[in-house]
C-alpha cells in the first residue's frame, strides 16, 4: 500500500492570555521537533496541553471544564463572578517553506468562542477546514493523546477497538446513514412479504364467499316466517298480561285506602310521643350539664389529691429533719457545757501553777543557802577560789559552752515534746470526727438505697399503670368512635325498615334448599349488591321480579327445588339455571354514552361465575341520575330501557313507571340486611370491649397517688444525696489532714529521739569536765578543806548547789505544766463550738418557717377539696332528681310508642299486602317490557292503536289485538295458557332449529363484489412494494460498500504497520527482533459491525490475552497501536500527556528513542511507510530518562507571587550526544 504522506509544518510557539492557570499574557516556545514539557505535579503541565487542544478546536467537555468560562484564569470565586473576563490562546504554525500561520481561539466576555486565522475572524467550519488541510483532524483527535488515553486504549474490548477504528477511518460518518437504510431495507422487505401474504389470503377468501352467497337467500326466507310466528305469540302474551294488570290495580287501590286511615292514627301517636320527648330532652340536657360540671370538678379534685399527698410527705420529711437537728443541738449543747467546764478547770489550774511559781521565787530569794564561815577562812576561800578559777578557766569555759548547748537542746526538746503532744491530740480529734462521718455515711447509704428501691418499684408500677391508662384511653376513644359510627350507619340503614314475614319465610326456604340440594347458590339479593347505596332503588326496579329469584346450577336442580316447595306448601319462587339460561350480550357502546349513564350490570358487585344470572336479570338496562337524561336516552333516536336512581323506569316502547311505594323501598332495603346484622354484631362486640376496659377515673386517682409517693421519696433521696455529698467533700479533707498529721508525727519522732540523745550526750561531757575540774579544785582546796573539817570544798558548796538544782528542777516542772495548760487552753478556746449550734438552730428556724408555709397551703387545698366535694354531691343530687323526671317521661314515651308500634304493625301488614300486589303488577309490567324489548331486539313490529310516542295512564302503548284469532282472545286458566304457550314454543323451536342448521353469511353478496375489487388493489400494491424494496436495497449496498472500503483501508494500513512499530518499541540488544503484534477481524464481511482482536507477544513470552499483560506491557502495546493509527492519518505534530507513566526505565528509554527517531528532521523529511511517518513530538513527562532525549525542554512551574503557572524554555541540542 502506498504511504500516506504527512502534511508538512510544525508548531513554532504558543501565546496565552488568562487561560486556566496561566495569568496575563504568556509566550511559550519555540517548540523543537522533539520538545518535552516538564514540571512538578500541580504546576500546570496538563493546562498547557489543554491550551494547545483548545486552540485546535477540541470541545470544552474534553478539557476538564463544563463551560468556556471555566477555562478563564480566576484567582478565587470573586474573580469568577466578575463580568467581562476574556481569554485567548494563539498557536503559531510554521510551514516547511517558512510561512507562519496564526490560529487564535478566544473566549469572549459573553462566554462564547471566537476563531481567527492570521487575525481574521472566521467561523468554526472554515477554521476546522484549514486545520484539516494541514492534516489536523479535530474530531478524530489524530494529533493528541490525553493523560489516561493509553490506559483506556489498553483496556478496550474488541468492539470498542472497532469503534476507535471507525472514528479514525471516517466510516463512522456513514454509520447513521447505513443504519437508516438498513432499517428501511428490512421494513421494505417486510412490507412486500405482508402484501404478498395478503394477496394470497384474498384469493382463498374469494372462493369462500362465492359458496356463502347461495346459502344466504334460503336463510332470509326462513327468518321472515319465524318473525311472523313470534309476532303472533307476543301479541297473545301481551293480551293476557294487560288483563291481569287491570285486576291487580283494583286490589291495590282498596288496600291503600285502608292504610291511609291507619297512618293518620300513627301520626297522632308519634306526635304525642314527640311532645314527651321534648320535655324529656330538657331534663336530659340538665343531666348532661351536671355531668359535665361534675367531670370538670372531679378533674380539678383529681389534681388536688396528689398535691395533698406531696404536701403530707414534705411535712413528714421537714418534721423528721427538725427533730434530727434538735437532737443534734442538744448533743452539741452538752458538748459545749463539757467544753466550758474543761476551760474553767484549765484556767483554775493555770492560776494555781502561777501561785506556786510566785511562792517558789519568793522562797528562793529568802533562802541564802550558805554555810557560816570565818572571815580569815573566807579570805582563804576566795583566794583559793580565784586560784582554782585561774587554773580551771579553760575547763570552765568549755563547761559553760556545753551548758549553753545543753540549755538550747533542752529548749528544743521541750518544743518538740509540746508539738508532738499537740499533734497526738489533734489526731485523736480527727479520728473521732472521721468515725462519726463514716457512721453517718453508712446510715445515709442504707436509707438512700431503701428509698431508691422503693422509688424504682413505684416507678415501675406507675409506668405499667400509665401504659395501661394510655392504652385504655386510646382503646376507649377508638371504641366510642367506632360505636358512634356503627350507630349512625345502623340508623341510616334501619330507618323505615320493618321485618317482612314473607321475606323471612322465603329466606328460611332458600336456606333449606341450599342445605338439601348441592347446586343451589342462593337468592339474587344475597349473591349480588349495588356497588353504591344510591343505586339500590334503581337496581331493585331494573331487576323487578328477578330480585328474589334463586340462582341454581342447572334445570334439574331447579325442578327439584320447585318440587320441594310444592311439597312443603311454601310460596312459589323463580329459578335461574346458570347452565341453560340464555342471555343477551352486553352492548359495549352503551358503556360510552357519556353523562351519568351507566349499564345497571356495571353497578352491581357479584361473583364472576354468576355473570349470566345477573345479566339475565338486568339485561342492557341503563341507569342515570336525572329524569331528563333518562328521557333523552329512552325516547330520542335509538331507544333504550332506562331507570333513574329515584326508581323511575322508562321503556323502549315509550312507557314510564314512576313513584316509590313502601313496598318498593322495603324491597330495595333488602340489599342492606346482611350489612345490618354484621353492624349490630360489631357494635355489641365493641360495647363489651369498652365495658372490659374498666374505669379510667380510678386509674387517674391511683396514678396521682403513686406520683405523690414517688415525689416524696425523690425529695428524701435528694436531701440524702446533699448530705452525702457534704460528707464526701469533708471526709477526704479530714483524712488528708490526718495523713498530714501522721506524717508530721513520724517526722518529729526521730527529731525528738535525736534531741534526747543530744541532751544525754551533753550531760556526759559536762560530767567529765566537772570531774577534771573537781580534781584540780580538790588539790587547791586540800589544806583549806582540812581546816574547815570537810573532805573537800564541794561538801561545803553541795548544800547550796543541791538546793539550787532542786529549785531549778521544780521551776522547770512548773514552767512545763504551765506552758502545756496554756497551749491546751488556747486550743480549746479556739474551738468555736457555739457556731455549729447557731447554724443548726438557724436551719431549724428556716425549716419551721417552710413547715408553716406548707401546712398553710395544704390547709387551703383541703378547704378547696371539701368545697369541690360538696358541690359535686349537690350536683349529683340534682342530677338524680332530673333522672327521675326523665324516667317518668320515658315511661309515657314507651306507652305512646307501643301504640305507634301496633299501628306500624298494621301498616306493615297492609304494606305487605300492597307490596305483594305491586310486585305482581311489576312482574307483569316487567314481562310486558321484556316482550316489547324482545320485539325491538328481533325487529318485530306489533300493531298499536295510538302513536308509540304518546303516553297515557296505562303501562305502555295500547296494542291492537284485533289481528289475533277469536280462539286466542278467550279467557283461559293458567294450565290452558301454558298449553297454548307450549304450542307456540314448539313451532318457534322447530323453525329456529331449521334456521340454525343453515347458518349462512347474509352479507356474502356484497362481500363477494368487494373482495374482487380488493384483489385488484392488492396486486397493484404488491408490484409497488417490490419496486421500492429494490431501490432501498441498492442504496443500502452502495453505502455499505463505501463504509467497508473506508474501514478496510484504515485497518489494512494499521495492521500492516503495527507489527513493525511494536518491534521497534520492544527490540533490544538482548532481543534484537523485538516482540510481535497483529490485528485480526472477527468478521471480514461486515468488519465494522464486529470486534477487532488486538494481540501482542512481548519478547520471550508466549501468546496471552491483553488483560494478562503487565501494566508496562499494556502501555507499550497501546503506544504501538496509537503510533500505527497516527501513521494512517498523520498530523504534522503529535502531543502526548504522560504516556510513560506506567513504564519502567528500560521501556521508557525505548519509547523515547522511538519518538526521537520519528521526530528528527531526517525522519520527517523521509516519509516512508516502511519506517513510519515523521512528526513533531511534544510530550509531557515526569521521567528524566525520557525527557533527556528531547531537543528542547519547556519547564512549567508555579509562580507563587502571581498565584499562576509560568514557563521557561531550554534548548538541549547543544548538549546532545553525537
Swiss-Prot record:
Mostly expressed in flower buds and stems, and, to a lower extent, in leaves and roots. Disruption phenotype: Altered chromosome dynamics and cell division during seed development, leading to aberrant mitoses and giant polyploid nuclei in endosperm as well as arrested embryos with a few small cells. GO terms for biological process: cell division; chromosome segregation; DNA repair; meiotic cell cycle; sister chromatid cohesion. SMART domains: SMC_hinge. It is found in: Nucleus; Chromosome. Transmembrane segments: none annotated. SUPFAM superfamilies: P-loop containing nucleoside triphosphate hydrolases, Smc hinge domain. Residues 518-632 form the SMC hinge domain. A motif (Nuclear localization signal 1) lies at residues 183-190. A motif (Nuclear localization signal 2) lies at residues 425-432. It comes from the Eukaryota. ATP binds at residues 39-46. Residues 11-1200 form the Zinc-hook domain. One of its GO terms (cellular component) is nucleus. Residues 159-505, 671-938, 1003-1035 form a coiled coil. The flexible SMC hinge domain, which separates the large intramolecular coiled coil regions, allows the heterotypic interaction with the corresponding domain of SMC1A or SMC1B, forming a V-shaped heterodimer. The two heads of the heterodimer are then connected by different ends of the cleavable RAD21 protein, forming a ring structure. Belongs to the SMC family. SMC1 subfamily. Cohesin complexes are composed of the SMC1 and SMC3 heterodimer attached via their SMC hinge domain, SCC3, and an alpha-kleisin subunit SCC1 linked to one SYN subunit (SYN1, SYN2, SYN3 or SYN4). Central component of cohesin, a complex required for chromosome cohesion during the cell cycle. The cohesin complex may form a large proteinaceous ring within which sister chromatids can be trapped. At anaphase, the complex is cleaved and dissociates from chromatin, allowing sister chromatids to segregate. Cohesion is coupled to DNA replication and is involved in DNA repair. The cohesin complex also plays an important role in spindle pole assembly during mitosis and in chromosomes movement. Essential protein plant viability. Required for chromosome segregation (e.g. This is Structural maintenance of chromosomes protein 1. It comes from Arabidopsis thaliana.
